[in-house]
Amino acid sequence: MPTRSREEYFNLPLKVDESSGTIGKMFVLVIYDISDNRRRASLAKILAGFGYRVQESAFEAMLTKGQLAKLVARIDRFAIDCDNIRIYKIRGVAAVTFYGRGRLVSAEEFVFF
């Protein structure tokens, strides 16, 4: 698969499912606050398989419903009571503007494991 810059990845045209009329992918933002270093690193590794790290404790991704379900299932198995993990789903056309230390990142299509 060809590599795309971070900017190209998030500005891909969204495909509409003809049968249901729904948009095929949604923008997802995952933020977290985990005090244990080992657990925090483990979660970051999980999230890196789905999207881009944009801050120390924040990842962005464009996911299908199925991919989102896999992500939620992995986080559900991972999370414990003292963790604070939030998943924000933005459906439809989402414009992302970044300032400051935002940088373009090249990445290949993500592999789920």
Curated annotation (Swiss-Prot):
Q: What is this protein called?
A: CRISPR-associated endoribonuclease Cas2
This molecule's function is given as:
CRISPR (clustered regularly interspaced short palindromic repeat) is an adaptive immune system that provides protection against mobile genetic elements (viruses, transposable elements and conjugative plasmids). CRISPR clusters contain spacers, sequences complementary to antecedent mobile elements, and target invading nucleic acids. CRISPR clusters are transcribed and processed into CRISPR RNA (crRNA).
Q: Which GO terms describe its molecular function?
A: metal ion binding; RNA endonuclease activity
> Which cofactors are named for this entry?
Mg(2+)
| Any one biological process term the GO annotation gives | maintenance of CRISPR repeat elements
- Positions binding Mg(2+) in this chain are D33
Originating organism? Mycobacterium tuberculosis (strain ATCC 25618 / H37Rv)
Q: Does the keyword Metal-binding apply?
A: yes
- Do you know which HAMAP family this protein is assigned to? Cas2
Q: Which family does it belong to?
A: Belongs to the CRISPR-associated endoribonuclease Cas2 protein family.
Gene from which this protein is expressed? cas2
